Amino acid sequence: MGRIFETRKATMFARWNKMAKAFTRISKDIAIAVKGGGPNPDNNPALRRVLQNARHLNMPKDKVEAAIKRASGQDQQAYEVVVYEGYAPHGVAVMVETATDNVVRTVANVRMHFKNNGGNMGNTGSVAFQFRRMGVFRLAPEGIDQDALELDLIDHGLEEMGESTGEKGEKVLVIRCAFESFGQLQAALEQRKLNVLSSESEYVAQTPVQLPEEQAREVLELVDALEQDEDVQHVFHNLA
């Protein structure tokens, strides 16, 4: 077949694996949201947010509906959200957010990933002080008067707003608020019928650090290993 075919095949499988991981993460988010607020998105802001993220990822509707149905059943696995902390190589701080039905398995796996990739897992609070938990919304910027929107949303918890680049190279408007204002800002955006692409809580690094390319690659190897773990939902770090 040749090298070009093998390269394309590897790229295709990598894309499929990434998509499968994203769908698994969304399914867990659905289970947690339904358990916390019921299966009706009209009455469950957390579920509305997750369904919004599912649409942004092009998760098939039948998979979304199946996840809601499973989450509504009595035999649905109960997931516990647990956050682990540690250091990657070269002192980079890492926060690992998991959703697990077996904490013993998860903590062992997370510790193994740190150890096998030159890092070390820490105790609760060992690196959390270097991050701030925030609500982060990503919007399509087309048709938005950003100055007017910023003034409008300040009273609803808005703290930061600016343009960024999405995974496909598209322009994205990023809005941040304190985690405590997440629900208030979500309601304000919904009321204004803005095109919100995704919204999540994130641990935002307060002081990002820069490393030479080779050292940064070592850090990202740990991040990649953690992200591939079935129990890991998100990995946050302070590498610039």
From Swiss-Prot:
Pfam families: TACO1_YebC_N, Transcrip_reg. It comes from the Bacteria. Signal peptide: none annotated. It is found in: Cytoplasm. One of its GO terms (biological process) is regulation of DNA-templated transcription. Belongs to the TACO1 family. One of its GO terms (molecular function) is DNA binding. The keyword S-adenosyl-L-methionine does not apply. This is Probable transcriptional regulatory protein Adeh_2184. InterPro entries: Integrase-like_N, TACO1_YebC-like_2nd/3rd_dom, TACO1_YebC_N, Transcrip_reg_TACO1-like, Transcrip_reg_TACO1-like_dom3, YebC-like. The lineage of its organism: Bacteria, Pseudomonadati, Myxococcota, Myxococcia, Myxococcales. PANTHER family: TRANSCRIPTIONAL REGULATORY PROTEIN YEBC-RELATED, TRANSLATIONAL ACTIVATOR OF CYTOCHROME C OXIDASE 1. HAMAP family: Transcrip_reg_TACO1. One of its GO terms (cellular component) is cytosol. Its main location: cytoplasm. SUPFAM superfamilies: YebC-like. Keywords: Cytoplasm, DNA-binding, Transcription, Transcription regulation.
